[in-house]
């Protein structure tokens, strides 16, 4: 095909994902080593099993199986009566056994589905399979020097040597494999956000853990004419298209960025009449591009065979015995119906399980609309402004509730509570009473407000005349004068009413 003909082709992206999720368990998947390795010295959370020493025998972690069943039920997948483990053979420094224990032809979950929204439009992606496996260790490429190790980590091309930490080796992973149902990088980002939301609600995933979500994405471009109106593509078309696998993606934003770059790269190759190599590429977060790593492996290269040290795992009884909590979509609908919230407010309040739980705690004590305003708008808004997450203040929920109580009990104005007290609480770590006392924000008594109203009227005859002439801004000016006299501690609505009474008397 000539370059001119290639340039005229309209191309469509076909994207499939392999999402590796670290499951939240106390110990590793096949041994008793702790998974709490964030602050541990390298290679201190290891044993003969996760290091693959001769004679060491694996035992399946019940907590990992339970977490996998929860995920399967949440994505409406088929969970077989029995599942098995296999060895995936390949040689890489972070894999101490030179094989990975995973699942091959009998995964614990298959044929699932996950719904999500893209710009308010509902979408659905088929989940081909979700299986259990062990995480490899972690590799750091390092430059020579005298500074801290973290400051000397770099790309493999620039490294003087490489260090391997096997603390992570054996951490339980669930690999979730989608069908190639995505047609745009933005869809991938929305899907990952929804998947992480569901995993967090299930309690099987900790997004704050380093490397807890890693994505491999497969992308190819096909003629747009091959894509049906419903987005379906004939399997033979996909088999003929060369695809690239992009690795080292660790975030929703990174996935969108990596796939946008890769789609553009492939489009330029095709439009110039060149072939797209079937290969594995590495996503460079710093530069926002992908670079070639190696030719893409095929399934046969891994020489899968049954893991003889692990018997078949019977999981049929788990499907009925393992419950799952109310998931975000169901909770969102309930918030709209039960509390009369808007769709927008309900979406904010169910963005994480912790936010939703906190809202319901506050709503039990106070009016639901007041609780929604404080949690969805005030609290989340201030956290977002500071680039903080709800998990950063989960030990201060009682203090936030105490602040809402001051507003509900008319001890402080809503404006001062939000714009002064809440902001200072987040910036200084002080409790609400301390901020209120320091700033003198206790609500002014009725007599003091009435006195300030009279003084404002007496001192501003021009504004009074404007008010009686129908000038709309006059009352706002007088409210401002009263608020200034009371140090902002009066309620503006109350002041407005008192001024009108006094002016009309």
Curated annotation (Swiss-Prot):
GO molecular function term, any single one: asparaginyl-tRNA synthase (glutamine-hydrolyzing) activity
Disulphide bridges: none
Claim: Plastid is one of the keywords in the record: no
Catalytic activity reported: L-glutamyl-tRNA(Gln) + L-glutamine + ATP + H2O = L-glutaminyl-tRNA(Gln) + L-glutamate + ADP + phosphate + H(+); L-aspartyl-tRNA(Asn) + L-glutamine + ATP + H2O = L-asparaginyl-tRNA(Asn) + L-glutamate + ADP + phosphate + 2 H(+)
SUPFAM superfamilies, A to Z: GatB/YqeY motif, Glutamine synthetase/guanido kinase
Domain of life the protein comes from: Archaea
GO biological process, one term: glutaminyl-tRNAGln biosynthesis via transamidation
A Pfam family matched in the record: GatB_Yqey
EC number: 6.3.5.-
Keywords: ATP-binding, Ligase, Nucleotide-binding, Protein biosynthesis
InterPro entries: Asn/Gln-tRNA_amidoTrfase_suB/E (IPR017959), Asn/Gln-tRNA_Trfase_suB/E_cat (IPR006075), Asn/Gln_amidotransferase (IPR018027), Asn/Gln_tRNA_amidoTrase-B-like (IPR003789), GatB (IPR004413), GatB_C_1 (IPR042114), GatB_Yqey_C_2 (IPR023168), Gln-tRNA_amidoTrfase_suB_CS (IPR017958)
Function: Allows the formation of correctly charged Asn-tRNA(Asn) or Gln-tRNA(Gln) through the transamidation of misacylated Asp-tRNA(Asn) or Glu-tRNA(Gln) in organisms which lack either or both of asparaginyl-tRNA or glutaminyl-tRNA synthetases. The reaction takes place in the presence of glutamine and ATP through an activated phospho-Asp-tRNA(Asn) or phospho-Glu-tRNA(Gln).
Family (UniProt): Belongs to the GatB/GatE family. GatB subfamily.
Subunit details: Heterotrimer of A, B and C subunits.
PANTHER family: GLUTAMYL-TRNA GLN AMIDOTRANSFERASE SUBUNIT B MITOCHONDRIAL AND PROKARYOTIC PET112-RELATED, GLUTAMYL-TRNA(GLN) AMIDOTRANSFERASE SUBUNIT B, MITOCHONDRIAL
UniProt-recorded name of the protein: Aspartyl/glutamyl-tRNA(Asn/Gln) amidotransferase subunit B
Organism field: Haloarcula marismortui (strain ATCC 43049 / DSM 3752 / JCM 8966 / VKM B-1809) (Halobacterium marismortui)
Taxon lineage: Archaea, Methanobacteriati, Methanobacteriota, Stenosarchaea group, Halobacteria
The gene coding this protein: gatB
